[in-house]
């Protein structure tokens, strides 16, 4: 394990991934010139816009736009919505069944826990979890924002490690994830996730006045947390943020994909991009952790949806242009063998951020899901130690 060290070696190939499942789209260097690619992208984008206008006009003026066809379309939408609502009910029931405490050999309960629903920024129901020390006041709170396609219940072990050290833990399932509302694996906007985090922070501050609060985000959740920290009204509520394997730099499968992604995300936002459904990249060196993840019915394992992929590209572009604006105390952790997100981007964050209090951990040979690696307890202890040191700095 290294502190503040770089990751050696360049790569001729990058990956775009769905984050939680390790599905990838290879990113190859283009053989075309930059100017040629730009011209081609503009031409393709223009063509798509004209096609959209043509289809829209025919749809409005054509014979299909009859009362009977509209009624049929309405029935299809209602059936689709009913199926989505049924899936949400199924997932919420599964989320309630997730084990919230580990077996204690001595039969003692050192943690109290609860699950609850919070109305999100758009009145969507957010499924949340709480773990807290059973016999002591919380000396701090960590809010966990999971990665793409997973859910908050996976962080039980780390949560109990935190409560043992006197920290309370809140965790929220994103929209379209775990027990929260929304189509499974579909994220209309990662800005919605930021707004929902703000709603949860309101509740936490109201219930725990004066208790210092940290945010932790994993993978795409790390990108969301980093962007959230750039908003002053969120930044002022936090003592610091922790980022594990953050998705800061993500490239599309081809430059043209980046050019047309905004259009496709509007035309067919929920379409599943099966070309990205490639398996084989391990995210942990612990076989038991991999088995638990991919056999979990609350982990989305289908192809990434078009709008979701576009949102990842969008937040990545935003962050890369705003690293110098980061001022919040932060700790970033990354495995050097991570093939899902780029450890070099974490190094860039550490180098460019304006934060006075910043720390970095690079773990030689470790993979993407750091809190599910065999050394998870050591990594968790380093995070807790960083929070302790940050709190001491605030009192100086």
Question: Where do the language-model regions lie?
Answer:
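Short beta-strand/loop motif that positions the catalytic acidic residue
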Residues: 326, 332-334, 338
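Conserved alpha/beta-hydrolase
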Residues: 154, 159-182
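Catalytic nucleophile-loop/oxyanion-hole region of alpha/beta-hydrolase
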Residues: 149-154, 177-212
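Short alpha-helix in the alpha/beta-hydrolase fold that links the catalytic acid
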Residues: 328, 342-351
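An N-terminal hydrophobic leader/cap segment in hydrolases
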Residues: 2-119, 124-134, 275
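Catalytic active-site module of serine/aspartate enzymes centered on a nucleophile-bearing elbow/loop
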Residues: 357, 361-396
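Short beta-strand element of the alpha/beta-hydrolase
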Residues: 138-147
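Alpha/beta-hydrolase-fold enzymes
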Residues: 10-12, 16-26, 216-304, 308
